[in-house]
Regions:
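Amphipathic alpha-helical repeat elements characteristic of tetratricopeptide repeat
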Residues: 248, 274-285, 300, 343, ...
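A structural "domain/chain start" motif
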Residues: 122-156
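Short coil/linker segments at helix-helix boundaries
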Residues: 280-409, 413, 420-443, 468-475, ...
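Alpha-helical protein-protein interaction modules
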Residues: 384, 413-740
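Catalytic-center loop of serine/cysteine hydrolases
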Residues: 87-91, 95-128, 160-301, 305
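An N-terminal, helix-rich hydrophobic module
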Residues: 1-117
Length: 740
């Protein structure tokens, strides 16, 4: 066969032009399918089907173009058309027009797709894209080869400090300590590690201590294929300087291999040594490993080790910072005195920052200090931002920022920060638990429960996950308070002195109108954790419910002394409202939310939660014009408030909040019934009917009284089921007998 003649014949029969036109048109159709089908929620296979059909059609169209010709009399076989009468040149011109037209449409589509579809895709997958494009690494715990288990903390601590050094680099994504240490003591598939932690590279190694010598082996591995990019063994004397030199050498080698660009200040930071004393460093490393359990006794042991570190080396700024944060943890998880703990935290933060004004962990502790002990949420946010600036890859710094945004009523930024923390340390129980809260706020309840189940399976000792799951099951859309109680009680049986479990079991009992059991759990809290704020909060609630107002007031005054007036508005509002002291109930709102008192009132995310209460109190005090104006502005604010797409419950709750202040009894009753029985909004009713500011006209209406009866009938049915469960489990106590 003569190739030139064959190609010439292909051109004459327009086979090449048909192929060109088909390829362009096929590409255009595929692009439209891949961009548009997902927007209409078409199944994945529909796009694949389109691609397969187009692929099959290509050879068929070429065969058709070769075998047939379009003539004035219609389609004929090419061999039946006299070459002198062929009109393939005219057909070719038509195909040229088709090609140009299809190319124009394709160009137009590319522009539209880049502006709209691609932009949306980029926004949706920004985190994933950033994760792929950023150099990323996980530092697995180095293996202790010394044969002495007491050296385990040293190898773990060394790994953590390598991780912390890398985490200071802005252009490097580093998996968090907790996630990386999940693989300790295993021989994991590195591809699995890379996939779970979202990293491309793994740093692993071993540590052997012998007398005053140390041998450290480190190797950098590509996660997807196990390829060793670099490996090195270091034999040195066991001194602080030598250890930090090794850490710096390993870090710089990783940076070189991953082609990470260092900022000038980052380059300087890599050479900094936190201490020159090996004994101080040993004590510090041991403390960092002890405190991770969050058990009060372990936190106390870590505090003792941090104290030892700063006693040996009074210039050890990082140890002061970690010591301060350990006191924060003891306040949260244990039974530390408020005033004493407050003083110790501030003292150690100040000392850390005096030695090193850029100690990121000190700013993390400072953020918690301002929230927990000063109620200064603006300063807390500033400190958390500084911590993230200094420690851009530290998941706990981002977690501190998440908490600070919560107290500053910046919901969107809170969500973004929670996602970032989870991206950095997805197997960290604290951070994953917070991320489940983000999923709940997005009304992705099944995903939240699935995540909590994963935490509970891998870390059954982490009781916060049980408490979070219990809360989700009790809340909409489930409303299963009884089943929620059983879940948390099972966890409580295994750890009956755990503060979180005692509180949560008492919470579920209170929501079931089961106050004898709630009282029992509160007494246990008072026995084990008398200084903890959650204990005081629970006792205040029960005192108010039982009409012991003087005792409730004493607790409110103590909390005010600890936290200041703004953070304790609720306590004094509830205390005075319950007693019919409406002027006194309004006073703290007037003091701390003055914008609600303006004419016209000004609403914002910080004060919107008090607007409905203020309307009711205005009406109780006969200030009806102010009440009507604020009610109007409040409803207008709620109507214009942005609610995330698909967040149906948020929309209903906003409507309910508006109806509650609008003197529209019929619609309010109808919506209450819908929320309780259809949306399963069943938590906090017994407490809410006492504490919440419900308009008098509504409370006095027969319709409302009937709804309350139906609510209690449902709650008491769930309570009866719980009592039966407790008796079947052999857990029942006579003092829990329900008293009407």
């Amino acid at each position: 066969m003569n190739i030139k003649n064959f190609i010439a014949e292909l051109k004459r029969r327009n086979v090449i032009k048909v192929a060109t036109a088909y390829a362009i048109a096929g590409w255009l159709i595929i692009q439209i399918a891949t961009s548009v089908f997902p927007a209409f929620a078409f199944p994945e296979w529909t796009t694949q089907f389109v691609i397969i059909v187009i692929a099959i059609g290509l050879p068929l169209s070429l065969i058709f173009a070769w075998a047939f010709e379009l003539t004035p009399e219609g389609i004929k076989k090419s061999k039946e058309v006299d070459i002198t009468q062929s009109v393939t040149d005219r057909t070719g011109k038509k195909l040229n027009g088709i090609i140009i037209s299809v190319l124009s449409i394709a160009l137009f589509f590319v522009v539209i797709e880049r502006i709209f579809f691609a932009k949306a895709s980029i926004l949706e997958d920004a985190e994933v894209t950033a994760q792929i494009e950023t150099a990323s690494i996980a530092v697995l715990p180095f293996v202790n080869m010394s044969g002495d288990m007491e050296n385990e903390y040293f190898s773990d601590g060394l790994s953590e400090e390598l991780l912390n050094g890398l985490a200071k680099l802005e252009d490097l994504q580093v998996a968090g300590r907790t996630s990386s240490f999940q693989f300790k003591g295993t021989n994991p598939d590195l591809r699995d590690v890379g996939s779970k932690l979202g990293v491309k590279h793994i740093l692993e190694g071993s540590v052997r201590k012998s007398g005053n010598r140390i041998r450290i082996t480190a190797q950098l591995i590509q996660a997807d294929n196990g390829f060793h990019l670099w490996s090195e063994t270091y034999d040195r004397e066991l001194t602080a300087n030598d250890i930090f030199d090794i850490q710096e050498e390993i870090t710089r080698k990783v940076i070189t291999e991953l082609k990470v660009k260092l900022l000038p200040q980052e380059n300087i930071a890599l050479s900094e040594q936190p201490t020159e004393d090996i004994e101080a460093y040993n004590a510090f490393l041991e403390a960092t490993q002890i405190e991770t359990s969050r058990r009060p006794e372990d936190i106390a042991s870590a505090i003792a080790k941090y104290k030892e570190a700063v006693r040996i080396d009074p210039t050890f700024s990082l140890a002061y910072a970690r010591l301060a944060y350990s006191y924060v943890l003891l306040h949260d998880y244990g039974n530390a005195s408020f005033e004493e703990t407050k003083e110790l935290i501030r003292e150690n933060i100040d000392q850390a920052l005096l030695i090193n004004s850029n100690e990121g962990k000190a700013y993390q502790a400072l953020s918690a200090y301002f929230t927990d002990f000063e109620s200064d949420f603006s300063k807390s946010l500033d400190a958390a931002k500084k911590a993230v600036e200094l420690l851009p890859n530290d998941a706990m710094a981002h977690n501190a920022l998440t908490n600070a945004y919560f107290w500053s009523d910046q919901e969107d930024k809170r969500n973004e920060s929670a996602k970032k923390a989870y991206q950095l340390d997805p197997l960290n129980n604290v951070i994953a638990g917070n991320y489940s809260g983000y999923l709940v706020r997005k009304e992705e309840f099944e995903a939240a429960l699935e995540l909590l189940d994963e935490i509970m399976e891998r870390s059954p000792e982490y009781k916060n996950a049980f408490a979070r799951k219990s809360a989700i099951l009790a809340d909409p859309p489930y409303g299963q308070i009884g089943e929620s109680f059983k879940l948390i009680y099972q966890a409580y049986k295994l750890d009956p002195e755990n503060r979180e479990l005692l509180f949560t079991v008492g919470d579920r009992a209170k929501e079931l109108d089961f106050f004898t059991l709630s009282e029992y759990m509160t007494k246990e809290l008072e026995r084990l954790y008398p200084e903890n704020t959650t204990t005081l909060d629970r006792r205040f609630s029960l005192n108010l419910m039982s009409g012991e107002f003087e005792k409730a007031e004493a607790i409110a005054l103590q909390l005010k002394e600890n936290y200041g007036g703004e953070r304790t508005i609720f306590y004094f509002r509830a205390l005075n409202y319950t007693q019919g002291k409406y002027k006194e109930a309004l006073a703290p709102i007037e003091e701390f939310e003055p914008e609600l008192m303006q004419n016209p009132p000004v609403l914002n995310p910080s004060n919107e939660g008090w607007a409905g209460t203020t309307v009711v109190l205005f009406r109780e005090l006969g200030r009806n014009e102010e009440a009507d104006l604020l009610a109007e502005k409040y409803c207008e604010y709620l109507e214009n408030k942005e609610v995330g797409e698909g967040l149906r419950l948020d929309e209903k709750f906003n409507k309910f909040s508006c109806l509650l202040v609008s003197n529209n009894t019929d619609e309010t009753i109808e919506l209450i019934e819908d929320l309780y029985f259809n949306e399963n909004w069943k938590r906090r009713w017994p407490e809410g009917l006492v504490f919440n500011t419900i308009p008098t006209d509504l409370k006095k209406s027969e319709e409302f009284k009937n709804i309350v009866k139906k609510v209690y009938a449902d709650l008491h049915a769930q309570r009866a089921n719980v009592i039966e469960y407790l008796k079947a489990e052999g857990e029942w106590k006579e003092e829990w007998e329900v008293r009407n």
